[in-house]
């Protein structure tokens, strides 16, 4: 395909620690990873998905591993320069109830993080709070 569809998915990729009600501990990356993978599967060879997120340096390899089987996911929008990502603790008390704690917040996504992706056909925003994507970024894209 000459001009594949390009979709940007912006927001945190938190390092999630999940404590199940059966006391199992699961470590995964969440939030933006889910729509990125879904869009990757939908687009297949007809497009590329670019997650845009600020992360901790120690999460670079783990996040790359999350997306390794998806050849149309381009990690050029992942930034660890400031070494500030999101960390979430999910503690399931039983099958239906959980406590969630945000232990660290990523630096917000600013226009400089989006600038090289303005040619995208679509932007998908997946913030956990109103802090992750600055208003100036939304105005910049508009």
For each feature predicted by the language model, list its residue ranges.
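Short Gly/charged-rich anion-binding patches and loops
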Residues: 34, 62, 136
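Short-chain dehydrogenase/reductase
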Residues: 29
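Glycosyltransferases and closely related glycan-assembly transferases
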Residues: 134-142
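Short amphipathic alpha-helix
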Residues: 32-38
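Conserved N-terminal subdomain of the carbohydrate kinase-like
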Residues: 3-4, 15-26, 41-126, 140
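Active-site metal-binding loops of divalent metal-dependent hydrolases
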Residues: 11-13
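Short, well-ordered, mixed-charge alpha-helical segments that flank or form enzyme active sites
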Residues: 17, 131-135
């Amino acid at each position: 395909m000459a001009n594949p569809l390009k979709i940007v998915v912006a927001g945190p990729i938190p390092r999630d620690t999940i404590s199940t009600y059966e006391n199992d501990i699961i470590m995964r990356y969440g939030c933006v990873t889910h729509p990125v993978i879904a869009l990757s599967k939908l687009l297949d060879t007809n497009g590329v998905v670019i997650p845009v997120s600020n992360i901790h340096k120690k999460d670079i390899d783990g996040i790359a591993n999350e997306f390794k089987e998806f050849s149309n996911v381009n990690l050029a929008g992942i930034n660890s320069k400031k070494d500030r990502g999101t960390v979430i603790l999910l503690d399931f008390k039983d099958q239906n109830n959980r406590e969630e704690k945000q232990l660290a917040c990523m630096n917000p996504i600013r226009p400089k993080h989006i600038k090289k992706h303005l040619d995208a056909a679509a932007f998908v925003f997946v913030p956990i709070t109103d802090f992750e994507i600055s208003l100036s970024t939304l105005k910049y894209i508009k």
